């Protein structure tokens, strides 16, 4: 790879990492009291999936260790936002589903997050946001293939 290509790659990933850090901070600031960004991410995933997931499946989805996911799931269960039950086919496994209060908490978080995100998109411009989305999606897919 040429020096110019290396410089482009470093600049691009530096911007992506900076945007990620700032986006997380701004989103975390408006989440409902007691909800962390990791909690919202899991609740949002379960709400979209519409089916139960095992802790191992969730850990893989979020590129976390099983221990880290178990910790997050215990916090979500304690808050009443997920139901964790034994897997009827394999007693060694558990299955996780979003609870009605978890769905409500996720909806409240989404309602708080949406204006923050929409404001940034508005300031950048919808056309620019639409133009960069396919590139970011392709980069995500390429990076996911590395795993």
What does each model-found stretch correspond to?
Residues 16-19, 23-27, 62, 105-124, ...:
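Alpha-helical linker/hinge and terminal dimerization helices associated
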Residues 8, 38-39, 101, 128:
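N-terminal positioning helix adjacent to the helix-turn-helix/winged-helix DNA-binding module
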Residues 16, 43-46, 136:
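Hydrophobic structural patches
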Residues 1-4, 127-147:
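C-terminal regulatory/oligomerization modules of transcriptional regulators
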Residues 74-134:
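Charged, amphipathic alpha-helical coiled-coil/dimerization segments
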Residues 1-33:
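N-terminal leader segment of winged-helix/HTH proteins
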Residues 21, 25-65:
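N-terminal helix-turn-helix DNA-binding core of bacterial DNA-binding proteins
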């Amino acid at each position: 790879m040429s020096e110019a290509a290396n410089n482009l790659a470093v600049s691009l990933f530096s911007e992506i990492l900076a945007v990620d850090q700032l986006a997380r901070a701004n989103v975390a600031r408006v989440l409902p009291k007691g909800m962390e960004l990791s909690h919202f991410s899991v609740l949002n995933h379960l709400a979209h999936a519409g089916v139960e997931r095992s802790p191992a499946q969730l850990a893989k989805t979020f590129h976390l260790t099983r221990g880290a996911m178990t910790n997050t799931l215990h916090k979500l269960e304690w808050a009443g936002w997920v139901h964790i039950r034994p897997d009827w086919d394999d007693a060694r496994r558990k299955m996780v589903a979003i609870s009605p209060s978890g769905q409500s908490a996720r909806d409240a978080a989404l309602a708080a997050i949406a204006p923050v995100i929409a404001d940034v998109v508005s300031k950048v411009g919808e056309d620019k946001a639409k133009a960069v989305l396919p590139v970011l999606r392709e980069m995500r897919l390429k990076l996911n293939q590395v795993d």
